[in-house]
Amino acid sequence: GVVVRHADLLPATQKKAATGRKLETRFTRGEPHARKRMATVAAVYYIEPDVRDAASVIAGLRRIKPATETKRPRPQNKRVWASLERPLSAVIAEMFDEAQRMDPERKRPWLVLVDGDKKLETAIRKTARARGAEVNLVLDAIHALQYLWAAGHKLCEEGTPELEKWVLDRFERLLDGKASDVAAGMRRSATKRGLSAQARAPIDTAAKYFLQRKNLMHYDLLLEAGTPIATGVIEGTCRTLINDRLDITGARWSLKGAEAILKLRALMQSGDFDDYWAFHTEREHHRNHASQYADEKPPALALRGPKPRLRLVK
């Protein structure tokens, strides 16, 4: 999210901002800040397969180096962009346009990593159907991991090795493609311990979430195929494209100003700035010069040779 002027907030956010505040100089606990407008961020790239298994992913989380360390493949031809102004559907359409440009014959599998937002998933499926594109939606595995941590805090003492072991054991089972088993096991644990409805709420929420999205959580097949299972590229893009420039202390942006900055930073990070600048200067020349003449054809200039220079002869 980016802090913008009140007039540039979405209507729902403006309504929250209009609620009375207890203090004039700072927010109190629980009061909505209601100062930010959320950006939609997208990235399209190609990456070579990197076959892994659940155990190697868990080892990576534990920062355990493998016996034979190999260089991980890096994203290629990566293009990124973000928008505060345009609707979600427009950003998704641009994402599909770029994917089509990179793979016009659709020889490669198209994977779309999402963070669990239902509106985002619905919009992607709708656009894919309209374009006749076959895409595989994948839920960010790290996003699923956060639900396990929230549930684990209700079953294990916070900050203990038992909590970490409980979470990682179930995360490994998620990576093995056993989302339904994990959901059922968590609910049984809550029932056996006799937790109240309020105490077990995070457990039931996580279980319901996994069951509803188990079709997006075939991590065992994805790891075997060597495809990504997490949105690390998007997380990095959010930091470098948005936060490093727009989320600075004391900044409050206009919508048009923030959108312009996002476009320029996206061009730089995607390696397209030189092409854009050549196009920009050509259009500026046309607007300020060529368009002022009939038929937009400036008269040819008679080029003169260099003027003779005077020399002091002694």
Segments from the language model and where they lie:
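Catalytic center-proximal scaffold of phosphoryl-transfer enzymes
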Residues: G1-K314
